Amino acid sequence: MNYFRPLYPFLLGWALILNTTSFANLSLVNGLGQLILFSAVVCIPIWRTGRMSYVDIGWPWGLVLLGIVSFFLSDGYWLRSLVVSIVLILVGLRMGLGALKMWQMGLLKKEFPRYQYQRIRWEKEGKTNVALALQVDAISQGLANASFLAIPIFIIASNNSPEFLVLEIIGLVIWLLAFAMETVADLQKIAFLQQMKKAGKQRQVCNVGLWRYCRHPNYFAEWMVWN
């Protein structure tokens, strides 16, 4: 059983960027930073607790790191680099601060359902060394930030043109609308949960605001953010 197979595409992607003349320095700094971040924030806690949920802290803060690195080390037009960095940092902070809040509330002491399902998948694949599979999955998340997620960021941030294309402006507008939508959806759900808690009600369906029209408006908006 090859436990390390999930890492191969990301390692290949990172190696390809490292071998480019334009992005080698960016990729090296970002990749090493991601590995250090994930080792401290994700891999060690997973090793100590056996729970995968710490990925929800490491991955968004990896986006923040990617945004900072791309701004300070890219050779593109400063305003374009700044815009790209701000977009990444805001996306990362939204999820990263939320994850820290969940950790503070003790919610990470229980494995999230999606990670419980991951264990079922491993069992079906014949993977019996769960501790190793957890570490490989966690590292793959950090390598994603170092490879395929970083490629479009580096390309855009390294564009020297001082003029913004119409397509870039359209993309920024879509991002602003989507980011606002998922923020509003999150706030509406938090308010709903607080109201249900005060009323002593449990397992209620959120059907207020944007949640009236879509089962997961925050997920839909998050998908649009990455478009």
Name each model feature, range by range.
Residues 1-215, 220-227:
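Membrane-anchoring alpha-helices and their flanking helix-loop junctions
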